[in-house]
Swiss-Prot record:
Gene3D superfamilies, per the entry: Umud Fragment, subunit A (2.10.109.10), Winged helix-like DNA-binding domain superfamily/Winged helix DNA-binding domain (1.10.10.10)
Organism: Cellvibrio japonicus (strain Ueda107) (Pseudomonas fluorescens subsp. cellulosa)
Family as reported in the entry's similarity comment: Belongs to the peptidase S24 family.
Molecular function terms from GO: DNA binding; serine-type endopeptidase activity
GO BP: any one term: DNA repair
Gene assigned in the entry: lexA
EC code(s) of this entry: 3.4.21.88
InterPro entries: LexA, LexA-like, LexA/Signal_pep-like_sf, LexA_DNA-bd_dom, LexA_repressor, Peptidase_S24_LexA, Peptidase_S24_S26A/B/C, WH-like_DNA-bd_sf
Enzyme class: hydrolase
DNA-binding region: 28-48
Annotated site residues (Cleavage) in this chain: 83-84
Protein name: LexA repressor
Length: 200
């Protein structure tokens, strides 16, 4: 949408998250400290670049003089995730939904547009927006966003003890259980389902 570099995207996501959690944007010094920049000047350069690209507006003379543009407010809606790419890569973000992330518990970091009917019996249908809390800490029986190799899927997580095998269960008898052996397959949990929105 804004053709951001990975570092600019990182700064933008920090500004959004910080603003959502505290009600006001971070200072340059806070951005530098959180992201490990050597100085506030480094943060300032990224902020200026974001403003040039239209992702934020700068209000001169204020230490917290950063405002997200209208299209940046709300929770990002992620469409199809290209193989191997981070879920919140800028090219995956279709839009933003103006619902406070605190509407969900735990809070939602993004919406993932659902493709397919493998989770229909859990009330998650094709085209729905799945509210996702970013975490890799999940419990048996929870609905998760998982990455297997380069593909992302939404399934119910099941694991016996500390075994290397994981099962990802669909909520539709027409689909098969996915068996993952973490000893020879790349596997990670990208987030936890915390709600679903259906748009007419």
């Amino acid at each position: 949408m804004y053709n951001l570099t990975s570092r600019q995207e990182q700064v933008l996501q920090l500004i959004k998250q910080y603003t959502e959690e505290t009600g006001y944007p971070p200072t340059r010094a806070e951005i530098a400290r959180i992201l490990g920049f050597k100085s506030a000047n480094a943060a300032e350069e990224h902020i200026k670049a974001l403003a040039r690209k239209g992702a934020i507006e700068i209000m001169p003379g204020a230490s917290r003089g950063i405002r997200l543009t209208e299209s940046q407010s709300g929770i990002p809606i992620v469409g199809r995730v290209a193989a191997g790419n981070p879920i919140l890569a800028q090219e995956h973000i279709e839009d933003y939904c103006n619902i406070p992330n605190s509407f969900f518990s735990p809070s939602a970091d993004y919406f993932l547009r659902v493709h397919g009917m493998s989770m229909k019996d859990a009330g998650i249908l094709d085209g729905d927006l799945l509210a996702v809390h970013r975490t890799d800490q999940v419990r048996n029986g929870q609905i998760v966003v998982a990455r297997i190799g380069e593909e992302v899927t939404v399934k119910r997580f099941k694991r016996q003890g500390n075994q290397a095998q994981v099962e990802l269960w669909p909520e539709n008898p027409d689909f098969k259980v996915i068996h993952v052996d973490m000893r020879d397959q790349e596997f990670s949990i990208e987030g936890l389902s915390v709600g679903v929105i259906r748009r007419d």
